[in-house]
Protein backbone atom coordinates (compact mmCIF):
# COMPACT_ATOMS: atom_id res chain seq x y z
CA UNK A 1 0.00 0.00 0.00
CA UNK A 2 1.32 3.43 -0.95
CA UNK A 3 1.89 5.56 2.18
CA UNK A 4 -0.25 8.61 2.75
CA UNK A 5 1.30 11.77 1.28
CA UNK A 6 2.39 14.83 3.18
CA UNK A 7 0.81 17.95 1.77
CA UNK A 8 3.11 20.93 1.11
CA UNK A 9 2.30 24.32 2.53
CA UNK A 10 0.71 26.35 -0.28
CA UNK A 11 1.66 29.86 -1.29
CA UNK A 12 -0.43 32.06 0.99
CA UNK A 13 -0.84 34.64 -1.78
CA UNK A 14 -1.46 32.40 -4.78
CA UNK A 15 -5.17 33.22 -4.89
CA UNK A 16 -5.06 36.60 -3.21
CA UNK A 17 -7.82 38.85 -4.55
CA UNK A 18 -9.68 35.91 -6.12
CA UNK A 19 -13.35 35.26 -5.44
CA UNK A 20 -14.04 31.53 -5.25
CA UNK A 21 -17.39 29.76 -4.99
CA UNK A 22 -17.33 26.09 -3.92
CA UNK A 23 -20.71 24.38 -3.98
CA UNK A 24 -21.20 21.63 -1.41
CA UNK A 25 -18.23 23.13 0.37
CA UNK A 26 -18.89 22.15 3.98
CA UNK A 27 -18.08 18.43 3.99
CA UNK A 28 -15.71 15.94 2.43
CA UNK A 29 -14.04 16.91 -0.84
CA UNK A 30 -15.83 20.27 -0.95
CA UNK A 31 -14.60 21.22 2.50
CA UNK A 32 -11.03 20.32 1.52
CA UNK A 33 -11.30 22.38 -1.69
CA UNK A 34 -12.61 25.39 0.20
CA UNK A 35 -9.82 25.09 2.77
CA UNK A 36 -7.19 24.84 0.02
CA UNK A 37 -8.34 28.06 -1.62
CA UNK A 38 -8.55 29.85 1.73
CA UNK A 39 -4.97 28.81 2.50
CA UNK A 40 -4.00 30.38 -0.82
CA UNK A 41 -5.49 33.74 0.16
CA UNK A 42 -8.80 33.60 -1.73
CA UNK A 43 -12.14 34.94 -0.59
CA UNK A 44 -14.14 31.71 -0.41
CA UNK A 45 -17.90 31.42 -0.62
CA UNK A 46 -19.51 28.06 0.09
CA UNK A 47 -23.05 26.81 -0.13
CA UNK A 48 -24.90 23.69 0.96
CA UNK A 49 -28.35 22.56 2.01
CA UNK A 50 -27.59 22.85 5.73
CA UNK A 51 -25.45 25.38 7.55
CA UNK A 52 -22.23 24.08 9.13
CA UNK A 53 -21.87 24.24 12.88
CA UNK A 54 -19.35 27.05 12.57
CA UNK A 55 -18.77 29.35 9.61
CA UNK A 56 -15.06 30.03 9.35
CA UNK A 57 -13.72 33.57 9.45
CA UNK A 58 -13.40 35.15 6.01
CA UNK A 59 -15.86 32.76 4.45
CA UNK A 60 -19.42 33.47 3.37
CA UNK A 61 -21.84 30.59 3.66
CA UNK A 62 -25.11 30.51 1.70
CA UNK A 63 -27.75 28.04 2.79
CA UNK A 64 -29.54 26.76 -0.31
CA UNK A 65 -30.61 23.54 -1.97
CA UNK A 66 -28.92 23.54 -5.37
CA UNK A 67 -30.99 20.60 -6.56
CA UNK A 68 -33.77 23.16 -7.06
CA UNK A 69 -33.93 26.11 -9.43
CA UNK A 70 -34.90 28.41 -6.55
CA UNK A 71 -31.84 27.32 -4.56
CA UNK A 72 -29.54 28.13 -7.47
CA UNK A 73 -31.21 31.52 -7.80
CA UNK A 74 -30.53 32.27 -4.11
CA UNK A 75 -26.83 31.47 -4.49
CA UNK A 76 -26.38 33.33 -7.77
CA UNK A 77 -28.24 36.44 -6.59
CA UNK A 78 -26.23 36.57 -3.35
CA UNK A 79 -22.89 36.09 -5.08
CA UNK A 80 -23.59 38.68 -7.76
CA UNK A 81 -24.97 41.29 -5.37
CA UNK A 82 -22.27 40.94 -2.70
CA UNK A 83 -19.23 40.12 -4.80
CA UNK A 84 -20.09 41.13 -8.35
CA UNK A 85 -19.41 37.58 -9.48
CA UNK A 86 -16.59 35.09 -9.02
CA UNK A 87 -13.20 34.36 -10.56
CA UNK A 88 -13.24 30.63 -9.82
CA UNK A 89 -16.32 28.42 -9.70
CA UNK A 90 -16.05 24.86 -8.37
CA UNK A 91 -19.14 22.67 -8.76
CA UNK A 92 -18.71 20.00 -6.12
CA UNK A 93 -22.28 19.53 -4.88
CA UNK A 94 -23.83 16.15 -5.58
CA UNK A 95 -24.03 12.56 -4.49
CA UNK A 96 -26.29 9.53 -4.58
CA UNK A 97 -29.47 9.02 -2.59
CA UNK A 98 -30.97 6.22 -4.71
CA UNK A 99 -32.15 2.94 -3.18
CA UNK A 100 -30.42 -0.36 -3.87
CA UNK A 101 -31.93 -3.03 -6.05
CA UNK A 102 -30.85 -2.17 -9.57
CA UNK A 103 -32.77 -0.44 -12.34
CA UNK A 104 -36.19 -1.83 -11.44
CA UNK A 105 -36.06 -0.26 -7.98
CA UNK A 106 -35.53 3.23 -9.39
CA UNK A 107 -38.53 5.53 -9.79
CA UNK A 108 -38.83 8.61 -11.98
CA UNK A 109 -38.34 10.65 -8.82
CA UNK A 110 -35.01 8.91 -8.12
CA UNK A 111 -33.76 9.74 -11.61
CA UNK A 112 -35.02 13.31 -11.48
CA UNK A 113 -33.41 14.00 -8.12
CA UNK A 114 -30.06 12.53 -9.22
CA UNK A 115 -29.97 14.73 -12.31
CA UNK A 116 -31.16 17.83 -10.48
CA UNK A 117 -28.52 17.39 -7.78
CA UNK A 118 -25.55 16.28 -9.88
CA UNK A 119 -26.17 17.88 -13.29
CA UNK A 120 -28.84 20.57 -13.44
CA UNK A 121 -27.36 22.37 -10.42
CA UNK A 122 -24.15 22.97 -12.37
CA UNK A 123 -25.91 23.92 -15.61
CA UNK A 124 -28.16 26.42 -13.83
CA UNK A 125 -25.39 28.02 -11.80
CA UNK A 126 -23.10 28.27 -14.82
CA UNK A 127 -25.88 29.98 -16.74
CA UNK A 128 -26.33 32.48 -13.90
CA UNK A 129 -22.65 33.28 -13.24
CA UNK A 130 -20.84 32.88 -16.56
CA UNK A 131 -22.20 36.18 -17.97
CA UNK A 132 -20.28 38.12 -15.29
CA UNK A 133 -17.17 36.08 -16.10
CA UNK A 134 -17.57 36.95 -19.77
CA UNK A 135 -17.93 40.60 -18.86
CA UNK A 136 -14.69 40.57 -16.85
CA UNK A 137 -12.95 38.56 -19.57
CA UNK A 138 -11.59 35.73 -17.42
CA UNK A 139 -12.57 32.89 -15.12
CA UNK A 140 -12.04 29.25 -14.27
CA UNK A 141 -14.76 26.63 -13.86
CA UNK A 142 -14.15 23.15 -12.48
CA UNK A 143 -16.85 20.50 -12.40
CA UNK A 144 -16.38 17.61 -9.97
CA UNK A 145 -17.57 14.50 -11.78
CA UNK A 146 -16.76 10.88 -10.89
CA UNK A 147 -15.08 7.82 -12.35
CA UNK A 148 -18.54 6.28 -12.17
CA UNK A 149 -19.35 8.17 -15.33
CA UNK A 150 -17.12 5.52 -16.98
CA UNK A 151 -17.44 2.78 -14.36
CA UNK A 152 -21.11 2.76 -13.28
CA UNK A 153 -22.15 0.66 -10.29
CA UNK A 154 -25.64 -0.48 -11.23
CA UNK A 155 -26.72 -1.81 -7.84
CA UNK A 156 -27.45 1.55 -6.19
CA UNK A 157 -25.79 4.48 -7.94
CA UNK A 158 -26.80 4.19 -11.60
CA UNK A 159 -28.67 7.55 -11.69
CA UNK A 160 -25.65 9.25 -10.08
CA UNK A 161 -23.30 7.67 -12.62
CA UNK A 162 -25.51 8.71 -15.55
CA UNK A 163 -25.79 12.28 -14.24
CA UNK A 164 -22.01 12.52 -13.85
CA UNK A 165 -21.59 11.27 -17.41
CA UNK A 166 -23.88 14.07 -18.55
CA UNK A 167 -21.90 16.58 -16.49
CA UNK A 168 -18.59 15.53 -18.04
CA UNK A 169 -20.00 15.71 -21.56
CA UNK A 170 -21.59 19.09 -20.88
CA UNK A 171 -18.30 20.39 -19.48
CA UNK A 172 -16.50 19.57 -22.71
CA UNK A 173 -19.10 21.35 -24.82
CA UNK A 174 -19.05 24.38 -22.51
CA UNK A 175 -15.26 24.57 -22.72
CA UNK A 176 -15.42 24.77 -26.50
CA UNK A 177 -17.85 27.68 -26.28
CA UNK A 178 -16.33 29.86 -23.56
CA UNK A 179 -12.63 29.05 -23.91
CA UNK A 180 -12.08 31.59 -26.72
CA UNK A 181 -13.64 34.20 -24.41
CA UNK A 182 -11.14 33.76 -21.59
CA UNK A 183 -12.88 31.19 -19.39
CA UNK A 184 -11.20 27.85 -18.74
CA UNK A 185 -13.38 24.81 -18.01
CA UNK A 186 -12.09 21.49 -16.69
CA UNK A 187 -13.51 18.37 -15.05
CA UNK A 188 -12.04 16.45 -12.11
CA UNK A 189 -13.22 12.86 -11.69
CA UNK A 190 -12.34 11.31 -8.33
CA UNK A 191 -12.48 7.64 -7.55
CA UNK A 192 -12.91 6.27 -4.03
CA UNK A 193 -11.96 9.13 -1.70
CA UNK A 194 -11.71 8.84 2.08
CA UNK A 195 -14.32 11.17 3.58
CA UNK A 196 -16.65 11.04 6.56
CA UNK A 197 -19.39 9.79 4.22
CA UNK A 198 -17.11 7.01 2.93
CA UNK A 199 -16.18 6.09 6.50
CA UNK A 200 -19.86 5.84 7.37
CA UNK A 201 -20.46 3.56 4.39
CA UNK A 202 -17.60 1.29 5.46
CA UNK A 203 -18.99 1.12 9.00
CA UNK A 204 -22.45 0.17 7.67
CA UNK A 205 -21.01 -2.52 5.42
CA UNK A 206 -19.00 -3.97 8.32
CA UNK A 207 -22.02 -3.99 10.61
CA UNK A 208 -24.43 -5.47 8.06
CA UNK A 209 -21.98 -8.18 6.98
CA UNK A 210 -20.69 -8.94 10.49
CA UNK A 211 -17.08 -8.32 9.47
CA UNK A 212 -14.31 -6.05 10.69
CA UNK A 213 -13.80 -2.59 9.26
CA UNK A 214 -10.63 -3.44 7.31
CA UNK A 215 -12.39 -6.34 5.58
CA UNK A 216 -15.26 -4.02 4.71
CA UNK A 217 -12.83 -1.49 3.25
CA UNK A 218 -11.07 -4.12 1.15
CA UNK A 219 -14.42 -5.43 -0.08
CA UNK A 220 -15.51 -1.96 -1.10
CA UNK A 221 -12.28 -1.38 -3.01
CA UNK A 222 -12.67 -4.74 -4.75
CA UNK A 223 -16.20 -3.81 -5.81
CA UNK A 224 -14.55 -1.09 -7.90
CA UNK A 225 -12.19 -3.64 -9.42
CA UNK A 226 -9.45 -2.85 -6.93
CA UNK A 227 -7.26 0.23 -6.43
CA UNK A 228 -3.71 -0.41 -7.67
CA UNK A 229 -2.35 2.30 -5.35
CA UNK A 230 -3.65 0.19 -2.47
CA UNK A 231 -5.68 2.84 -0.65
CA UNK A 232 -8.50 5.32 -1.14
CA UNK A 233 -7.53 8.84 -2.10
CA UNK A 234 -7.59 11.78 0.29
CA UNK A 235 -9.87 14.79 -0.07
CA UNK A 236 -6.80 17.02 0.21
CA UNK A 237 -5.32 15.34 -2.87
CA UNK A 238 -8.40 16.19 -4.90
CA UNK A 239 -8.29 19.75 -3.54
CA UNK A 240 -4.68 20.16 -4.63
CA UNK A 241 -5.54 19.06 -8.17
CA UNK A 242 -8.49 21.49 -8.28
CA UNK A 243 -6.30 24.34 -7.02
CA UNK A 244 -3.67 23.62 -9.66
CA UNK A 245 -6.21 23.58 -12.49
CA UNK A 246 -7.71 26.87 -11.30
CA UNK A 247 -4.36 28.59 -10.86
CA UNK A 248 -2.08 30.55 -13.15
CA UNK A 249 0.20 27.50 -13.16
CA UNK A 250 -2.15 25.80 -15.63
CA UNK A 251 -2.95 28.46 -18.23
CA UNK A 252 -3.30 26.00 -21.14
CA UNK A 253 -5.16 23.26 -19.29
CA UNK A 254 -8.64 23.60 -20.67
CA UNK A 255 -11.44 21.29 -21.74
CA UNK A 256 -9.95 18.23 -20.08
CA UNK A 257 -11.05 15.57 -17.63
CA UNK A 258 -8.53 14.77 -14.90
CA UNK A 259 -9.01 11.44 -13.15
CA UNK A 260 -7.73 10.98 -9.59
CA UNK A 261 -8.53 7.40 -8.63
CA UNK A 262 -5.33 5.60 -7.61
CA UNK A 263 -5.42 3.67 -10.89
CA UNK A 264 -8.92 2.21 -10.46
CA UNK A 265 -9.78 2.68 -14.14
CA UNK A 266 -7.41 0.28 -15.90
CA UNK A 267 -8.01 1.38 -19.49
CA UNK A 268 -6.35 4.21 -21.38
List PLM regions with ranges.
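Short C-terminal tail/terminal secondary-structure segment
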Residues: 2-11, 100, 231, 242-243, ...
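Conserved glycine-rich cofactor-binding loop
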Residues: 19, 26-27
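Substrate-binding pocket helix/loop in short-chain dehydrogenase/reductase
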Residues: 99-103, 107-115, 141, 223
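Alpha-helical segment proximal to the catalytic Tyr-Lys
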Residues: 131, 176-177, 251
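Catalytic loop of short-chain dehydrogenase/reductase
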Residues: 142-166, 171-180, 192-193
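Short, small/polar-rich loop/turn modules that mediate ligand/substrate recognition or access, typified
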Residues: 179, 184, 253-255
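A conserved structural motif in NAD(P)-dependent oxidoreductases
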Residues: 215, 226-238
